[in-house]
Regions:
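Rhodanese-like catalytic fold shared by cysteine-dependent sulfurtransferases
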Residues: 1-36, 43-77, 85-121
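Short cysteine clusters
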Residues: 81
Length: 121
């Protein structure tokens, strides 16, 4: 994908600085109330299907919205997108903002669905 080479490089650099979590682990932490799952996809993607119990904050506004919706910088936050790129960037950004326990869900919503985990509309 030469047309996305710069984006892919940016994501690869971000992934060096963050921790990823598998969808099954994210599901367990969401179910137990241990983590807040944040869907950073665009609204139309969210409307097409999302993780039950997740919070929507698009990649374009997460830095503006996060402090109001998740004020505790020690809260566990699991970001996810469609495939793992945008969530890696969002995770890195939240870490820079002082959030200490942020993870990016490996493989994004595609991996969540592939693991046959529940979805909602």
């Amino acid at each position: 994908m030469a047309e996305h080479a710069r984006f892919e490089k940016l994501v690869a650099e971000a992934k060096k600085n963050i921790t990823e979590i598998l969808p099954q682990d994210a599901a367990e932490r969401l179910k137990s109330g241990e983590a807040v799952v944040v869907d950073v996809r665009d609204k139309d993607e969210w409307d097409d299907g999302h993780i039950p119990g997740a919070t929507h904050m698009s990649r374009g506004t997460i830095e503006l919205d996060i402090e109001e919706k998740v004020p505790d910088p020690n809260a566990m936050i699991i970001c996810h997108c469609g495939g793992g790129g945008r969530s890696a960037l969002a995770t890195e950004s939240l870490q820079k903002m002082g959030y200490k326990s942020v993870r990016s869900m490996a493989g994004g919503f595609k991996a969540w669905k592939a693991a046959a985990l529940p979805t909602a509309k």
